[in-house]
Amino acid sequence: MRLITHNMLSCNIKGVTSGFPLRIEAGNVIEKEVDFNPDFIRHMFAKIEWKALVEGARSMGYAELPEESPDAAVLKSDEPFLKKLHHALLELHLEEGALVCPETGRKFPVNKGIPNMLLHEDEV
């Protein structure tokens, strides 16, 4: 599971009001090279919840992103930053581990890079 995916997932258990961001418990993290496309990264930046991305990246062992979200000027001119963001969003893969609901503590397993977000009958 890539961090770009993680940034769009939330806990949908009935009654949960603060199910985002899911905390990552990383078991196995791998890196898979992906072609760098700066225009795609710039486009996706507006859709990303920055704090969740930084926390997710750090939980997967990647600490190259700044705490504070950069401004638009950085996105236009700072290619090294865009490459770091690209790496975090697209090249880091959580192969094994879990996503944990911040409100309930419910763990959603991640196996072979696929998060299992299915709810139990009593959670629907």
Swiss-Prot record:
SUPFAM superfamilies: Trm112p-like. GO terms for molecular function: protein heterodimerization activity. GO terms for biological process: organ growth; regulation of cell cycle; regulation of cell population proliferation. Disruption phenotype: Semi-dwarf phenotype. Reduced organ growth due to inhibition of cell proliferation. InterPro entries: Trm112, Trm112-like. Residues 2-120 form the TRM112 domain. Coiled coil: none annotated. Acts as an activator of both rRNA/tRNA and protein methyltransferases. Required for TRM9 tRNA methyltransferase activity. Involved in the regulation of cell division progression during organ growth. Required for the expression of cell cycle-related genes, and the G2-M phase progression during organogenesis. PANTHER family: MULTIFUNCTIONAL METHYLTRANSFERASE SUBUNIT TRM112-LIKE PROTEIN, UPF0315 PROTEIN-RELATED. Belongs to the TRM112 family. Interacts with TRM9. This is Multifunctional methyltransferase subunit TRM112 homolog A. It comes from Arabidopsis thaliana. The lineage of its organism: Eukaryota, Viridiplantae, Streptophyta, Embryophyta, Tracheophyta.
